[in-house]
Amino acid sequence: MDLEAARNGTARRLDGDFELGSISNQGREKKKKVNLIGLLTLFRYSDWQDKLFMFLGTLMAIAHGSGLPLMMIVFGEMTDKFVDNTGNFSLPVNFSLSMLNPGRILEEEMTRYAYYYSGLGGGVLVAAYIQVSFWTLAAGRQIKKIRQKFFHAILRQEMGWFDIKGTTELNTRLTDDVSKISEGIGDKVGMFFQAIATFFAGFIVGFIRGWKLTLVIMAISPILGLSTAVWAKILSTFSDKELAAYAKAGAVAEEALGAIRTVIAFGGQNKELERYQKHLENAKKIGIKKAISANISMGIAFLLIYASYALAFWYGSTLVISKEYTIGNAMTVFFSILIGAFSVGQAAPCIDAFANARGAAYVIFDIIDNNPKIDSFSERGHKPDNIKGNLEFSDVHFSYPSRANIKILKGLNLKVKSGQTVALVGNSGCGKSTTVQLLQRLYDPTEGKISIDGQDIRNFNVRCLREIIGVVSQEPVLFSTTIAENIRYGRGNVTMDEIEKAVKEANAYDFIMKLPQKFDTLVGDRGAQLSGGQKQRIAIARALVRNPKILLLDEATSALDTESEAEVQAALDKAREGRTTIVIAHRLSTIRNADVIAGFEDGVIVEQGSHSELMKKEGIYFRLVNMQTAGSQILSEEFEVELSDEKAAGDVAPNGWKARIFRNSTKKSLKSPHQNRLDEETNELDANVPPVSFLKVLKLNKTEWPYFVVGTVCAIANGALQPAFSIILSEMIAIFGPGDDAVKQQKCNMFSLVFLGLGVLSFFTFFLQGFTFGKAGEILTTRLRSMAFKAMLRQDMSWFDDHKNSTGALSTRLATDAAQVQGATGTRLALIAQNTANLGTGIIISFIYGWQLTLLLLSVVPFIAVAGIVEMKMLAGNAKRDKKEMEAAGKIATEAIENIRTVVSLTQERKFESMYVEKLHGPYRNSVRKAHIYGITFSISQAFMYFSYAGCFRFGSYLIVNGHMRFKDVILVFSAIVLGAVALGHASSFAPDYAKAKLSAAYLFSLFERQPLIDSYSGEGLWPDKFEGSVTFNEVVFNYPTRANVPVLQGLSLEVKKGQTLALVGSSGCGKSTVVQLLERFYDPMAGSVLLDGQEAKKLNVQWLRAQLGIVSQEPILFDCSIAENIAYGDNSRVVPHDEIVRAAKEANIHPFIETLPQKYNTRVGDKGTQLSGGQKQRIAIARALIRQPRVLLLDEATSALDTESEKVVQEALDKAREGRTCIVIAHRLSTIQNADLIVVIENGKVKEHGTHQQLLAQKGIYFSMVNIQAGTQNL
């Protein structure tokens, strides 16, 4: 009887899962060989208890799996009894009452069978519970061990390993990969054994009860298997193609979102949208082809299934009529084999999960087994009692493991006596920081040795060595806990008094006492709640509580403004007393009083001595000091280059900061914390996105209504096939009462043909159902994606500044949201229609044939349905709850891994490990509770079927004996309703996750409906006929929305008349680039106004306004297309003719270079223009700006990134471009702006000085000192 459960649930579950996983993955795995670990290795962390759990779980799974085939034996015997006795009940009701005898016998027989069913049900109840809960328990225990071991292994790796691995990847491994293992070693293994047991038991029962029929049915199975395999192959080929097309669309979107400022400034939104839609169209076409081919094969599969029913019934009936089998036997064989065959489908997702787990475990176990050369957990090595602090580097060579071919140190020799302060100076990238890292033994030198007190540091115990060293680095990392805890990381057993003493020494006591929570103030993620100077002082206190013998200060004050610098510097001078100190500084004024100053160049020390000695030598140090003569205001070129816009500067005032990231791969751990915030963001989003009704989503698909009509009709037909099957089945059983054999054979032939007919019908209905909904779904996905992309391009800059809308997050949203919504509309609707039709027609037919039994069964259906739904919910909910629970642990892990350098230099690995382990108890306790709950719901949903069989047939026999129903009607009612219910229970399992889809839809609609503050698509506002080009800023006040508390412009007023050139100068972060962004109307000022030709910018149409401006920025972004297309991007309002492109190129001095390229103007420039040099990119950007014939030209440090040679060429091009246009120039190289009509010096967001070059020099103010500093630079 359970055939249908099998057909409806499992068969379809089989399609569902194939589609989702197994085959498409196999297809992909062939392409890239995935490393898997051995089957048993996966369980290498199981102890005897786990093994016992797994052993008992497997035994019970096998027992549980054998239940259904055994039930079929009972069913067969019962059918025989019914059929034999039916002859006695063909008389009218009143007779049967008088002939009590056979009725009494039948009822007794039925009662006995009811007990058998109940017995089996009881067995299944226990077995299913043990199977699921024991496997889940064992998995939970092992996963906890794996997480601990894995985190421990990560913490003990050496730095070089992290440089190569990248920290973000490790975080995903710790969360996603471990949960893949957990998926693969838990209840899925039990399910697998259960399915395999069902398979074998089914076939064994089949062979014992009737081998002939078994062989005939088996002959058909290969064809069915083959059709499934072909189907899966087709699917995976199309899926790969579709993914490739979507990936291309994704790349376009990512490129546009990554360069959003350029796109908006040049009005390129529609161009990007068209490029995106072109790729989406391709994907859609492939998707539709996929829907056609996949559904043809699905139709064929159903045709084959029905054909096999027809053959089996026809052959079976022949055997029954020739008295070889009884009808019961034939039934037993038929259903046992079917159940057995379909159980294979159920094993597929389990095998898939297991393969995923083996793949994930390969990487994880590999890391666990990796033994680092520098092991901070090791107890080996010398642990000296007291350290004097004499350091010596002798002939040290070194290159970073991640870039082994670039040598950083090339034979470094340096001696530091105990208690001395040595300062290291030199250009960026010369090896200063590397020296500090080698001393902490974060790396080992490739040649040479480093010794402390004459002992090679490799002989020290690693932990001991690091405990005697205190480090304060340029970007101190604080952990998101309280101030006191942060200081305690310096030394675990430190008392509150010691903390206060250290804080006083670090000049931090006063500001801490002013905070409301004092020492218990939380510092936020990476110390975000504190200013740079405050963080720095806490880091110094943290280094001091260690009471280190050796203090390493790596640009400890570079991130500070003058005021905090003085305080921190005083703290450092106090801290240095009596300790051996190595200082790295770019501000040379801070190291004048060092005992020894060592000048680095190119990985070796070229000079050392005191300040006065080195000044006499006139070497490197002398040159560096001269550049900085003005002292107060460093304009050292080398940093300014790296600062692409002042936003970066605003985040961290340091000039050197960006430079360091580029220079030093070792700073990788500064990788943006945003990536790890993505998960949290999704939660933030969930909280504030209003939910969306299902109908609203459907409305988007309303143009495709004909597809929906056809699809729904077919789905209803598919649903009705099942009750039709029940009718034919009951009719066939009824044939085999006493009677004429020839008539029987004739009827059987007829019914077999009807089965075949149903098969042909199902081919068409399944194909049409799948195809129509599939096509409508593809159209919807394409539509949603392009609407979403369009809506994103429409947003204002402040929206893009929000970390929740980083390029990565937006690209992911574009890719996943639309697909998830499709999952919940197309196929889901089809399934709902199909299952409702199934249960609906089933109930109607049942009421017609036997309302009493139908009522009894309907009272049971809710239980079966609810149990099915609960089980599916449990399955889905598991992962979600675990994720929540794991977040606390994940936070600790993420923090430790991202800031691994800090953790290691503070020797706090053990502390983090114990915090992590403590946080794992929650998820583990959860998994125990979950194991039991899940076990109970699963066992109830599995056993209920057996109990309902018992009740149904016992009551059925009563109805038959009393003449209320015929036997065939009992079978009909029973199969129609039970199968309908089973289908309903399963519907929830293969319908894609509805909740996810709702969330995605909600997110998409909130995006579609968001009204940007400055709408780039808007047609409102004035479109003046002519524009002279004068620009005025009137008392403008502005802060960036993402950092509302950091003032940028504080009442800025300036004016530039038409045709004039205005130059803006000032230190980084003073608001120069902000002026350009306000003019482009990326943002609106908070107070004051920006006027163009006397009209307020807000009143002008945005598109018109931007069309008047041409912008060339310091780091111009080019798109991955040809040179001609990049230049033409300057004017997206029309198709730019080729001769104009050439003219612009000539004006920008780039034409001769383009002519030398083989493909000339059709040369592709590569991603972000990587195929070109800086100067070439810069000149193409100038040509791009000139194409639009702008009235106002904005040059934001357009030459700063260039070497002298290219600078000259580009500068000429710019001078040519400025003719007859209003021009606003931002420059750090003052020589380039001497001939500007007006020079404005900005400081702290206000105008401090203005005038021509000569006037300003005469004032001897800020501009004067800046020119002087740079005059020194020229002799470099």
UniProtKB/Swiss-Prot annotation:
Start and end residues of each stretch annotated as Interaction with HAX1: 622-646
PTM annotation, UniProt: Phosphorylated. Phosphorylation is required for PC efflux activity. Phosphorylation occurs on serine and threonine residues in a protein kinase A- or C-dependent manner. May be phosphorylated on Thr-41 and Ser-46.
Regulation: Translocation activity is inhibited by the ATPase inhibitor vanadate and the calcium channel blocker verapamil. Translocation activity is enhanced by the addition of the bile salt taurocholate.
Keywords for the protein's UniProt record, in alphabetical order: ATP-binding, Cell membrane, Cytoplasm, Cytoplasmic vesicle, Glycoprotein, Lipid transport, Membrane, Nucleotide-binding, Phosphoprotein, Repeat, Translocase, Transmembrane, Transmembrane helix, Transport
Catalytic reaction(s) noted: ATP + H2O + phospholipidSide 1 = ADP + phosphate + phospholipidSide 2; a 1,2-diacyl-sn-glycero-3-phosphocholine(in) + ATP + H2O = a 1,2-diacyl-sn-glycero-3-phosphocholine(out) + ADP + phosphate + H(+); a 1,2-diacyl-sn-glycero-3-phosphoethanolamine(in) + ATP + H2O = a 1,2-diacyl-sn-glycero-3-phosphoethanolamine(out) + ADP + phosphate + H(+); a sphingomyelin(in) + ATP + H2O = a sphingomyelin(out) + ADP + phosphate + H(+)
UniProt binding sites for ATP 1: R403, G429, C430, G431, K432, S433, T434, Q474, G1174, G1175, Q1176
Induction context: Up-regulated by compounds that cause peroxisome proliferation, such as ciprofibrate and clofibrate (at protein level). Up-regulated by compounds that cause peroxisome proliferation, such as fenofibrate, ciprofibrate, clofibrate, bezafibrate and gemfibrozil.
SUPFAM superfamilies per the UniProt record, alphabetical: ABC transporter transmembrane region, P-loop containing nucleoside triphosphate hydrolases
Residues the entry annotates as binding ATP 2: G533, R1043, S1068, G1069, C1070, G1071, K1072, S1073, T1074, Q1114
Major location (coarse): membrane
Enzyme class (EC, first level): translocase
Compartments it resides in: Cell membrane; Apical cell membrane; Membrane raft; Cytoplasm
GO biological process, one term: positive regulation of phospholipid transport
PTM annotation (Phosphoserine): residues: S24
Transmembrane segments: 48-70, 116-136, 186-207, 213-235, 294-315, 330-351, 709-729, 753-773, 829-849, 851-870, 931-953, 970-991
Family per record: Belongs to the ABC transporter superfamily. ABCB family. Multidrug resistance exporter (TC 3.A.1.201) subfamily.
Function in brief: Energy-dependent phospholipid efflux translocator that acts as a positive regulator of biliary lipid secretion. Functions as a floppase that translocates specifically phosphatidylcholine (PC) from the inner to the outer leaflet of the canalicular membrane bilayer into the canaliculi between hepatocytes. Translocation of PC makes the biliary phospholipids available for extraction into the canaliculi lumen by bile salt mixed micelles and therefore protects the biliary tree from the detergent activity of bile salts.
The protein's name: Phosphatidylcholine translocator ABCB4
Source organism (scientific name): Mus musculus (Mouse)
